[in-house]
From Swiss-Prot:
Organism, as annotated: Bacillus subtilis (strain 168)
UniProt superkingdom: Bacteria
InterPro entries, per database record: SAM-dependent_MTases_sf, Small_mtfrase_dom, tRNA_Adenine-N(6)_MTase
Role, per record: Methylates cellular RNA.
Disulfide bridge partners, by residue number: none
A GO molecular function held by the record: methyltransferase activity
Gene: yabB
Protein name: Probable RNA methyltransferase YabB
Family the UniProt entry places it in: Belongs to the methyltransferase superfamily.
């Protein structure tokens, strides 16, 4: 039986018929991670996937419903790592998903170069120029701000881990899209697919999904936009399907 700590809860992933351990004081996944797990290419039958900055394991759990590939999640925060491990155990996915507690910058040396088919990441979004701009909760501060890893770290490590032709998928903020493109190209990952996510019609995009191929040829595709809320401030049909399935 998987135990919960005092500040933890067990949330349903309705579309996937799974449960995940969350904590309002430590970490709770956002819609961004769910969108990344639906956006990323994954091999259906076999292969090797790495999810960097895995948090409580939300992306590996969701990817396991789309792929039979071996999935590895990497998380630097010990408490989040523990939550992810217990969530994997609760869903009886130990044979497919492994969660390791380590710094993602160590992964090329530990896991080997050119060995993975897919790398996914929902990285910290914000640079950390001033202490006053950082969230005061340590767990959230590390998850949201580039304290232990930068965007360049994520992309350079992804490139080292990927096979030629392997795919890297990120979710991030639109303001850093050009930086993502520049870094991908610098590390031999060619941007291939981009999708802009909007809070609702008439608003600016607040999230981007980007996928690149290691050693790929230039041919960028802009996918149709994704709107989260309709005019009644309810989830759009597409988002409802992603979150709740076709029920």
């Amino acid at each position: 039986m998987v135990s919960l700590h005092d500040d933890e809860r067990l949330d349903y992933l309705l579309a996937e018929d799974m449960k995940i351990i969350q904590s309002p004081t430590v970490f709770a996944f956002s819609l961004d991670a769910v969108l990344l797990s639906k956006f990323a290419y994954v091999p259906i039958q076999k292969g090797k996937i790495v999810d960097l900055c895995t948090g409580n394991g939300i992306v590996p759990l969701l990817l396991s419903t789309r792929s039979k590939a071996d999935i590895l999640g990497v998380e630097i925060q010990e408490r989040l790592h523990d939550m992810a491990v217990r969530s994997v155990e609760y869903n009886k996915l130990d044979d497919q998903i492994q969660i390791i507690h380590d710094d993602l910058k160590n992964m090329p040396e530990k896991l080997g170069h050119n060995r993975y088919d897919v790398v996914t990441c929902n990285p910290p979004y914000f640079k950390t120029p001033k202490q006053t701009e950082q969230n005061m909760n340590e767990h959230l501060r590390i998850a949201r701000h580039e304290i232990h890893c930068t965007l360049e770290d994520v992309i350079s490590v992804s490139s080292k881990l990927l096979k030629q032709g392997g795919k890297a998928a990120l979710v991030h903020r639109p303001g850093r899209l050009l930086e993502i493109f520049e870094l991908m190209k610098a590390y031999q990952i060619e941007p291939k697919r981009v999708q802009f996510v909007y809070p609702k019609q008439g608003k600016e995009a607040n999230t981007i999904l980007v996928e690149g191929i290691k050693g790929g040829r230039p041919d960028l595709k802009i996918l149709p936009p994704l709107f989260v809320y309709d005019e009644q401030n309810e989830y759009t049909k597409e988002i409802r399907t992603i979150l709740y399935g076709d029920k």
